[in-house]
A protein has these predicted regions:
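Short beta-strand edge/turn micro-motifs at domain boundaries
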Residues: 112-120, 124-162
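Short, low-complexity N-terminal intrinsically disordered segments enriched in polar/charged residues
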Residues: 3-56
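Short, well-ordered coil/turn elements that cap or connect secondary structure elements
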Residues: 2, 98-100, 146
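Compositionally biased amphipathic helical and low-complexity segments enriched in hydrophobic
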Residues: 2-4, 74, 150
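Short secondary-structure boundary micro-motifs
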Residues: 6, 92-95, 107-110, 123-126
């Protein structure tokens, strides 16, 4: 008897919201570590390794504050955006080192498929003085071979102002 049974995990809204919270918490943690370069570097690498899919293939990452090197298609490019200190991305000052005291996601909508999902909305970054910065996002997610949810699309932009 050969039962060829496959178990599939369907991506849920809870999965998306958990990864969004983990991403925001990691960004806040990076800012709190900015005076300890080694710990900050380790946390940045951990964030990217845990949540992004660079080790699985292409990641399309367009950060908010990137003009000269707009697209971060490599692990090193993403890391530089978050914590700076990379001469190949000299415009980067380290977005996560602002620092931020809170990051809150507000999904406008989410498209859920069996092995992939897309979320679009606004996220809100709170500065130490309480000022809140609103940023628009689109994130794409996929399940890797271990059924871990990973980011393979990340586009951020500041809202249009006329």
């Amino acid at each position: 008897l050969n039962l060829n049974i496959k178990f599939y995990t369907m991506i849920t809204l809870d999965n998306i919201e958990n990864v969004q919270k983990e991403w925001g918490d990691s960004l806040v943690k990076l800012g709190s570590l900015k005076s300890n370069k080694e710990a900050c570097n380790n946390e940045a690498e951990s964030l990217i390794n845990r949540l992004y899919g660079y080790q699985n293939g292409t990641v399309l990452f367009k950060p908010t504050k990137a003009k000269d090197n707009q697209f971060r298609l490599t692990f090193e490019g993403a890391k530089s955006y978050f914590i700076g200190e990379n001469s190949n991305f000299s415009e980067d000052k380290g977005f996560a080192l602002q620092p931020w005291t809170n990051v809150r996601f507000e999904n406008a909508s989410v498209i859920l498929n069996e092995k992939s999902a897309t979320a679009m909305g606004n996220y809100f970054f709170t500065e130490p003085n309480g000022n809140v910065v609103k940023v628009e996002y689109t994130f794409g997610y996929f399940l890797d071979s271990n059924q871990d949810l990973r980011i393979n699309l990340h586009h951020s932009s500041l809202p249009y102002s006329n």
